[in-house]
């Protein structure tokens, strides 16, 4: 089932997405999010996560950086904490906030 879903997502990216234009308010895009979710969490859970993400992606959504939970990108977006303090704050680094402009 996983290869079929990945193939359908690839077909969407190649055949339909160029004609529909970029409308996603999130980074990674919803189709990239769906691909990552299926790869990292399997067909059933990944499909559910992708469906929930599609429901969050609408014209009134704030958008922004929203990686798939449990992936390497998510780990860098949400640093581990130690004794209630961020590892980055403990090392003297300023927190990084990513804001994307609204289209």
Curated annotation (Swiss-Prot):
Organism: Cupriavidus necator (strain ATCC 17699 / DSM 428 / KCTC 22496 / NCIMB 10442 / H16 / Stanier 337) (Ralstonia eutropha)
Family: Belongs to the UPF0161 family.
Database matches in Pfam families: YidD (PF01809)
Bilayer topology annotation: Peripheral membrane protein
Highest taxon of the lineage: Bacteria
Presence of the UniProt keyword Cell membrane in the record: yes
InterPro entries: Membr_insert_effic_factor_YidD
Known function: Could be involved in insertion of integral membrane proteins into the membrane.
SMART domains for this protein: Haemolytic
Region entry Disordered, spans: 68-91
Predominant location: membrane
Keywords, comma-separated and alphabetical: Cell inner membrane, Cell membrane, Membrane
Lyase among keywords: no
GO cellular component: plasma membrane
Compartment(s): Cell inner membrane
Protein's name according to its UniProt entry: Putative membrane protein insertion efficiency factor
Lineage: Bacteria, Pseudomonadati, Pseudomonadota, Betaproteobacteria, Burkholderiales
